[in-house]
Amino acid sequence: MDTVTSKELPTLGLGLHFEDLPVGRAFRTIGRTITEPDIVNFINCTGMTEVLFTNLEFLKHESDIKGRLAPGSLVYCFAEGLLVHATMQKTGYAFLGMTLAIENPVFAGDTIHVEVAVTESRRSKSRPNRGIVTTLNRVVKQDGTTALTYTPTRMIKARGTGEG
């Protein structure tokens, strides 16, 4: 260690480049358990204070949903958080759009992970040092059920311009 400077050490945890994301590449993230404090903090931070998320008596007696329900937007945000740590540090330039479908509820105590498959990948015509990548992302609960799916398109840093 004495002969290696800090700047010479490789940095772990950096994102994937455009060239690392060809069509067909697939991977999954680590898991993350959704807790009751996560839900309470999220609904208070976002102002999503509808009774479905804030009133346990309503859930017990007036709703067919039983248990502390997580808003779909919380599940999406946590999925993106799992992906940022795994794939986009210093390489993600822009979020360009997506479609999203909520398929099953997530409750406090559920653990989610994200399964990702690259469906489109091309070098940007106007910015050849970047790529445009679309993925199919499935947020999966511990029992194997899909909570939500979404298809983000992102601008990702490339290692080079693709010339030469």
Task: Identify the role of each PLM range.
Residues M1-P22, I102-T111, E115-G164:
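HotDog/MaoC-like acyl-thioester-processing domains
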Residues D2-G97, R159-G164:
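Hot-dog-fold acyl-thioester-processing enzymes
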